[in-house]
Amino acid sequence: VRYESAATLVALSQSAAAIRAAAACYVSLLCTASDNNVKLIILDRLVDLRQQHDGIMQDLVMDVLRALSSPNIEIKRKTLNLVLESVSPRNVVEVVQLLKKEVLKTQSKEIEKGAEYRTMLIRAIHQCAVRYPEVATSIIHVFMDFLSDSAVTSALDVMVFVREVMEKYPALRHGLLMRLCEALPTIRASRVFRIALWVLSEYVESPEEVSLSMAAIREALGPLPLVGLRGGVTSGRAVGGK
């Protein structure tokens, strides 16, 4: 009944008050409905409303994010897409803080498709940081913990994000370089390792940074030489992944 009432309200009136009331009704249903198909339909209606009435969802973004509690990955994906289209300077800090908490939750093995969900969250936060650079400094150090993620996509997204932050915020470089040196020996994916090496070679400047970087690289490589006298691989640490 509430769904039909909201749909009727949208059909009969295009006033801002009517659209806001309908959107609030949809969001309330989104958070209380138990059927995943119903949630997906409601998300589609909210997307339509946002497209027709730009800005209407900005005050409801935090309520929409409650739908992330659903274990269904498609509901999570549609919710994040809707939120990214509705984020604004007024709510971006709150949005990013909530998404950061969700990222930390994905470390639990109890979360279904945790690696895929973590990748979605990291990319969502990355997009927010690109559009609103002021939020980047509040989350970048948390992200560094995921450079050793076994999910290559997540780790790669984090490394690309770190590289962008270093490029745009020179004042943050030293701290991030130190964290990167700490994380380097734990990185598992070769693609992530390559970007990390590029970042170190590009932004390391002081003798202290050079010394720490070289020590981290040596630790990551393992005992030398990497190849024995007859071409056999020694016990040196290999970085895996694609």
Spans of features found by a protein language model:
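Extended alpha-solenoid helical-repeat scaffolds
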Residues: 1-242
